[in-house]
């Protein structure tokens, strides 16, 4: 009996490596399709991946072949029409094959290649090259600290960490698997030899044949090594980093009466995308939700996205609450502080200069990055022009963008959180 042992470390997902190589090769096509999908469907609709279509011409492999034209000597087996030395006129048309008619100078020769990417792969491409700007370590004495913890068994490792019990158990199982049938035959032959010696002591031929077969089986069993490199098992120790870069994101959303339902929906979709990005890319991050109209209120995630409360507009109330929470819970020497604000720009006239002063004097000196998105198809409001002064004073830590429609959310989001090149 033959045995096939699959020693591949990726046995259950045999095509994973090839799939990753394929995704890397056609990264441009996939990123374009993901960007189109984000603009087409709801931000909350992330329970599935996306169908990707790649034109057939882009998946062709380069090959070497004879060019058209020239003189060729070809042997056609079973040819009954021509004899050696006859000249055959060149076929008309520029296309290959045996189709009738002239070759066409347009059209495609292959169907598009369509495949499905998973939700995990979809989100990977969606948030590729994005990060929180200016993230630094806070409250540290030096380098990162790590904690070594047990993480199971590995097939490779340091000889000093070999797990003897698991190694011998694996070796024993392998020897049983490889020599099981031979051992069964050996037991049967020994019983047969014992019977021959008792019942047929003069049957020297069968006794000798049984003894030779027993020796052959013993030699076959002995050829199975006691220990194989595949049997070696090691205690796996991994280093878990202790959190050293603590970050908090303040989400400030205007829910005043001037915000139409469409404008509120765009603001919510922007914050849903931001929240999804933070939770996927950062393990240790706090998110503070603040809704405001004439007064500000810290709320939980559910109320932030689904509450229907509304009122007048005093933007400074949200900034004041953010500053109070920063002072109370998030000291700047220990935390990386970020903020994202969404509004339609309408504000009580005397309040916009106050917002500028609060930002410049009480918030911006202590935050890593502050983003403001104004959701309006009209001209910018007074708040935008006051924030221009903040952008001039803190050009590296303050950014503002305009959203006109839901289609602008993803491009603006990528622009705000694009990974920056560091020298």
UniProtKB/Swiss-Prot annotation:
**UniProt-annotated stretches for the region Disordered:** 84-109
The species is Stutzerimonas stutzeri (strain A1501)
Similarity section: Belongs to the UPF0229 family.
Listed name of the protein:
UPF0229 protein PST_0721
Q: From which residue to which does any coiled coil extend?
A: none
Q: One matching Pfam family, short form? A: DUF444
**UniProt xrefs under InterPro entries:** UPF0229, vWFA_dom_sf
Q: Which domain of life is it from?
A: Bacteria
């Amino acid at each position: 009996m033959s045995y096939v042992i699959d020693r591949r470390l990726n046995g259950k997902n045999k095509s994973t490596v090839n799939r990753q190589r394929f995704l890397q090769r056609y990264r441009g096509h996939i990123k374009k399709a993901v960007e189109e999908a984000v603009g087409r469907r709801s931000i909350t609709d992330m329970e599935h991946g996306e169908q990707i279509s790649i034109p057939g011409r882009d998946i062709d492999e380069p090959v070497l072949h004879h060019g058209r034209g020239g003189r060729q000597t070809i042997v056609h087996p079973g040819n009954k029409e021509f004899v050696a030395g006859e000249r055959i006129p060149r076929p008309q048309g520029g296309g290959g094959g045996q189709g009738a008619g002239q070759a066409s100078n347009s059209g495609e020769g292959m169907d598009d290649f369509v495949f499905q990417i998973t939700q995990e792969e979809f989100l990977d491409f969606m948030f590729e090259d994005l990060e929180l700007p200016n993230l630094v370590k806070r409250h540290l004495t030096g380098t990162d600290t790590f904690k070594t913890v047990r993480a199971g068994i590995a097939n490779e490792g340091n000889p000093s960490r070999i797990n003897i019990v698991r190694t011998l158990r694996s070796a024993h199982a392998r020897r049983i698997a490889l020599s099981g049938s031979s051992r069964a035959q050996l037991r049967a032959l020994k019983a047969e030899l014992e019977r021959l010696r008792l019942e047929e002591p003069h049957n020297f031929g069968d006794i000798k044949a049984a003894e030779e077969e027993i020796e052959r089986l013993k030699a076959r069993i002995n050829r199975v090594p006691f220990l194989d490199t595949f049997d070696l098992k090691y205690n796996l120790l991994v280093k878990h980093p202790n959190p050293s870069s603590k970050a908090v994101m303040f989400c400030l959303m205007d829910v005043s009466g001037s915000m139409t339902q469409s404008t509120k929906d765009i603001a919510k979709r922007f914050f849903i995308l931001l929240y999804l990005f933070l939770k996927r890319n950062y393990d240790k991050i706090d998110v503070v939700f603040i809704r405001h109209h004439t007064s500000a209120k810290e709320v939980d995630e559910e109320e932030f996205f689904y509450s229907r409360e509304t009122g007048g507009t005093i933007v400074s109330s949200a900034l004041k609450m953010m500053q109070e929470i920063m002072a109370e819970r998030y000291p700047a020497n220990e935390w990386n502080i970020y903020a994202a604000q969404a509004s339609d720009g309408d504000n009580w006239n005397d309040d916009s200069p106050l917002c500028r002063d609060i930002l410049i004097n009480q918030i911006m000196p202590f935050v890593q990055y502050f983003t403001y998105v104004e959701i309006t198809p009209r001209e910018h409001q007074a708040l935008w022009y006051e924030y221009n002064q903040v952008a001039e004073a803190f050009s590296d830590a303050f950014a503002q963008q305009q959203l006109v429609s839901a289609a602008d959310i993803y491009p603006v989001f990528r622009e705000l959180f694009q990974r920056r090149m560091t020298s």
